[in-house]
């Protein structure tokens, strides 16, 4: 297995992700993307629409769960429309989001890594909901009373 570092993971601002969601692909390269929400018990009160939920606590403990995520992501990328941009986030994207991105990164070989671009959503869901919580086109299950 190859060795990668956090430099292989970039940060993405919520405004850029919002733009991607509105356009249906990344802005510059027109590539597909997938949001992965790694919150655990704090996965309530809303989530980014069409995001996949893979709790970090399970990803770090269960190799099969991580393989499932990796398989789904590589399968989604298999359509040949360029690299799949994978955006991880947790509540603040300070620990679990970056750690989950590193777990996936370390599970990829060189060929697989060439098929993915890894991101962490800057500010996590907390920042996302403060701007886009009420926007039902990009946020699902939002409960504003939990955020006041």
UniProtKB/Swiss-Prot annotation:
Localization in the cell: Cytoplasm; Nucleus
InterPro entries referenced in this protein's UniProt entry, alphabetically: Rhodanese-like_dom, Rhodanese-like_dom_sf
EC number: 3.1.3.-
PROSITE patterns assigned to the protein according to its UniProt record, in alphabetical order: RHODANESE_3 (PS50206)
Nucleus among keywords: yes
Record note on pH: Optimum pH is 7.5.
Main localization of the protein described in the UniProt heading: cytoplasm
Keyword Cell wall biogenesis/degradation: no
Gene3D superfamilies for this protein: Rhodanese-like domain (3.40.250.10)
PTM-bearing positions, type N-acetylmethionine: 1
Keywords per UniProt: Acetylation, Cytoplasm, Hydrolase, Nucleus, Protein phosphatase
Rhodanese domain boundaries: 29-137
Molecular function, one GO term: thiosulfate-cyanide sulfurtransferase activity
Function: Protein phosphatase.
Family: Belongs to the MPI phosphatase family.
Miscellaneous comment as given in the Swiss-Prot or TrEMBL entry: Present with 2310 molecules/cell in log phase SD medium.
Record's protein name: CDC25-like phosphatase YCH1
Organism: Saccharomyces cerevisiae (strain ATCC 204508 / S288c) (Baker's yeast)
